[in-house]
Amino acid sequence: KVNVFSPTMIQEVSNLLDQVPTDKGSLLIVGRPGIFSAGFDLKVLMSGDAENAVNMLRSGFTMLSRIFSFPRPIVAACSGHAIALGAFLLCSCDYRVGSKGEFQVGANETRNNMIVPTPILELAKFKLAKNHKQRALLNGEMYSIENAIEPGYLDEVVEPDKLLEIAMVKAKDLATLGHPYYHQTKQLDQEEVIKKINSGIEKITVSAIMPK
């Protein structure tokens, strides 16, 4: 299992977001050891069922938009490889802690004959370092997890046995941020990019990702 975002998994995460308090606390997202996420379920994208594929894409990008704009802080414990949508999930979170290891982080879409669509481009441009935008998004460069801080995928990298401990400490610290002050500041910061992300989601088609 590589933690792919299938329609079922996207729905499960979306249901979880519905249940998390939006006026207090914080949220910690953790992947399985060795793999944070490898992105969308390619079997669905390549199944020939365009409606199912589009629904998966739109719901997946909507999920990222919700995480990105969530009223409370979200911390990611990146436990391994974070590829494609997995890397963009990191971009959606407010603080990202990575585990040392032989892991890669990055967006490999252009190296796999796929397009990085508008919602993801807008999210990534907002979170990734400007001097890495060409390398990360257009060149499809993959970064070792220990080199993923400079481009903006991660905020710190720690020993594997300390990952959850340090991520939890950070989540508890961010949970003390006052409501609604954190949320309202985030809204002001993200106002323009959220409009672009959500507008792009409405226009998503399979050919916008995988042109014939």
Where are the model-predicted features located?
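Short, active-site-adjacent cap segments at secondary-structure transitions
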Residues: 34-37, 82-84, 192
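C-terminal long alpha-helix characteristic of the crotonase
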Residues: 98-103, 150-200
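Catalytic-core regions built around general acid/base machinery
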Residues: 16-19, 59-71
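Hydrophobic/aromatic residues within transmembrane alpha-helices
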Residues: 29, 41, 89-91, 148, ...
